[in-house]
């Protein structure tokens, strides 16, 4: 099974550069605006899109992403509408991978089989489900693999050598290395330690390693890019969108332009870093 994620990372490896993986919250601040943001991301330089599934109790998310999820839910966003966003995007872009990220409760209530059928039909390529450990592979991971959808796992600085093989077992697409312990949007980790961790994980897998949590600026993204196959940026993009909203969470400025300006700067920095390192 070769997915869009596999194809994208193979292309980037041939180009000698890492991926820019961009996260935003589905339905934030409303469905129409979020869909415009999603469609604009690849043109701004995003290689992979992480599409957040808003949830009422997001335990791993920092204040910015929690607020984005709340805005989306208040605007009427549902899992069905998030899948609709993927389907609308896919009609115009058949190459950029879409990874849906969120919590298992949403999928469980929707129905696993129904969700996987609808996700595949909508052009979704991968899933990151932060609260579903490898011991529960039969719940979603294995059915997703059978449906042709990558199941992407998180590793952290506390994932030891005993735990790592269990985390990597049945993982596909790429490995998401969380560069620090804590919630999204916290301070960036020491890049040298990130490099050590990535090299260590690579001894146990051939999958690309993408690093996220705490990456906010083009300079930080460039520093991480020297060590990883991909850089994940989420909170900074969510904050760029939020900066164009009023106190009630309604659009007052141009969230699409704000998000794409940031992504363009991130993409330029990430790509230049690897090119400089190769010279």
UniProtKB/Swiss-Prot annotation:
Q: Which GO terms describe its cellular component?
A: cytosol
Q: Pfam families, per this entry?
A: Trp_syntA
CDD domains, per this entry?
A: Tryptophan_synthase_alpha
Key words, A-Z: Amino-acid biosynthesis, Aromatic amino acid biosynthesis, Lyase, Tryptophan biosynthesis
Q: Which catalysed reactions does the entry list for this protein?
A: (1S,2R)-1-C-(indol-3-yl)glycerol 3-phosphate + L-serine = D-glyceraldehyde 3-phosphate + L-tryptophan + H2O
Gene3D superfamilies for this protein: Aldolase class I
What pathway or pathways are given for this protein in its record? Amino-acid biosynthesis; L-tryptophan biosynthesis; L-tryptophan from chorismate: step 5/5
- Enzyme Commission (EC) number: 4.2.1.20
Enumerate the InterPro entries for this protein. Aldolase_TIM, RibuloseP-bd_barrel, Trp_synthase_alpha_AS, Trp_synthase_suA
Molecular-function annotations in GO: tryptophan synthase activity
Question: Which residues does the entry assign to the active site, renumbered to this chain?
Answer: 50 (proton acceptor), 61 (proton acceptor)
Q: Does the keyword Lyase apply?
A: yes
Which SUPFAM superfamilies does the UniProt record give? Ribulose-phoshate binding barrel
- Is-annotated flag, keyword rRNA-binding? no
Which family does the similarity line name?
Answer: Belongs to the TrpA family.
What HAMAP family does the record tag this protein with?
Trp_synth_alpha (MF_00131)
> NCBIfam families recorded for this chain?
trpA
Q: How does it assemble?
A: Tetramer of two alpha and two beta chains.
**Function recorded in the entry:** The alpha subunit is responsible for the aldol cleavage of indoleglycerol phosphate to indole and glyceraldehyde 3-phosphate.
State what protein this is by name: Tryptophan synthase alpha chain
């Amino acid at each position: 099974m070769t997915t869009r994620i596999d194809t994208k990372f193979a292309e980037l490896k041939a180009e000698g550069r890492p991926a820019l993986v961009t996260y935003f919250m589905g339905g934030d601040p409303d469905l129409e605006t979020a869909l415009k943001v999603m469609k604009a991301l690849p043109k701004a330089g995003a290689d992979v899109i992480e599409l957040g599934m808003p949830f009422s109790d997001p335990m791993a998310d920092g204040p910015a992403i929690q607020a984005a999820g709340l805005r989306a839910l208040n605007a009427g966003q549902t899992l069905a509408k998030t899948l609709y966003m993927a389907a609308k995007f896919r009609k115009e872009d058949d190459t950029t991978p879409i990874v849906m990220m969120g919590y298992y409760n949403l999928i469980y209530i929707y129905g696993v089989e129904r969700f996987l059928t609808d996700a595949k039909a909508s052009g979704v390529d991968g899933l990151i489900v932060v609260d579903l450990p490898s011991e529960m592979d039969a719940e979603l991971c294995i059915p997703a693999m059978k449906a042709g959808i990558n199941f992407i796992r998180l590793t952290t600085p506390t994932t030891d050598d005993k735990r790592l093989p269990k985390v990597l077992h049945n993982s596909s697409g790429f490995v998401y290395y969380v560069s620090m312990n804590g919630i999204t949007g916290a301070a960036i980790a020491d890049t040298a330690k990130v490099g050590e961790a990535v090299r260590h994980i690579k001894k146990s897998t051939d999958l690309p390693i993408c690093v996220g949590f705490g990456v906010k600026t083009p300079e930080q993204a460039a520093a991480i890019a020297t060590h990883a196959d991909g850089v994940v940026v989420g909170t900074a993009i969510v904050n760029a969108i939020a900066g164009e909203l009023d106190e009630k969470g309604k659009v007052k400025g141009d969230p699409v332009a704000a998000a794409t300006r940031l992504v363009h700067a991130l993409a330029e920095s990430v790509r230049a870093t690897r090119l400089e390192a190769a010279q």
